[in-house]
């Protein structure tokens, strides 16, 4: 019984260490641009293609839902003019980076795991190693950089679409004036908020690619093992993202003075 209890934490620590090692190997191969730049462009296009439309379909109604809550609360306090400021803070600081990360992990990350996992069970990874081709530099490095790059584009797209959805709901449904909505943008928002949003998106995209590539490289058990690796990769990525998001948000509030 004691062995069964202690084996779980040991497995988690070992998995985390292996993921960290894979990510370090991927970062180490970044200077070898000649090896990975073509695959990097292909992965950027693929991730953007599979995530752009879903992220738009999510961000617009998501912005409307936030506008519903913020607008109702502001009306109760008699502070409708603060609706725009609260909307920008909610979307730019938290909603946009997290939504971007979840889409990259769910759509792009699952495809990465399935692709690398399929190569693994067909012994293509072993064949690359036999031919002295580093699978980390060839497969992992371009995906790490591609997911991080596309995340920067998607977080901007989510922010604009979410604020547009919030504008439609606040102005047309809740009858907040357009001037009050837009004037609130500068009341509480500051430039570090935008940098924080971009930093979160980059880190979350990197985490999604790191976990996905790792689960693909170490999957076992044939086609069923690939499916299990895809499911595990998505779940682990979500856990990492929410944990890292808490840490980054805490550090941001501790280091950056707020406009209140």
Residue spans of the language-model regions?
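Membrane-interfacial helix-loop-helix connectors in multipass membrane proteins
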Residues: 69-93, 160-202, 210-232, 251-260
